[in-house]
């Protein structure tokens, strides 16, 4: 783990804060784009995701890595629980500064002062209750914060916002991803072998120019990348013209 001087960190923060101030709360981006879920301080896995080579590139040509050419959306939770939170946040902030139009960095609950203070260096996992059938939203008594939601709530939210798919993070999934509510909601979790204790895969979602969705799975310890092409029903296809993302993910149910 490298060390950072106070001057380096303050300079990095000042530069990225100025960029964030200039951006709208509701960010819009056109595909193709890669969506990354929770990282939680797992720096090596973050680097591995960013260093994937462009799929269309000739094997004999000079490697062109995705971190400098692709568009990325991060759903938050870059820090806490892992051992290299500082490295992770410094890397994504540096990429935002170098490629401001290619990176959208959303704020997860672990990017709030209270949560960061509480979980910064502790190992903690929480098992939530099963999602109920009724009512659509109820208080999450198991975790003591936020709410639980069901399929009816997802359908109503999509109808009100006129959207076809909600992509969220904030929850470990054994396969790295999971669809819900007839594929109108997908949870993405990008930290394989979470906290070096759970035998889960990591995943990222890729949205092609035509709106087609694929999921890249990263396993641990061999870190083999495997592509699953998910054929979405026509009414579940993403609008390929633009994607809208909230910069304050804490307003979403989790």
Swiss-Prot record:
Name of the featured protein: Uncharacterized protein F44B9.9
GO molecular function, one term: protein serine/threonine phosphatase activity
UniProt signal peptide: none
Matches recorded under InterPro entries: Calcineurin-like_PHP_ApaH (IPR004843), Metallo-depent_PP-like (IPR029052), PP1_catalytic_subunit (IPR050341), Ser/Thr-sp_prot-phosphatase (IPR006186)
One Pfam short name: Metallophos
SUPFAM superfamilies the UniProt entry points to: Metallo-dependent phosphatases (SSF56300)
CDD domains: MPP_PPP_family
GO cellular component: cytoplasm; nucleus
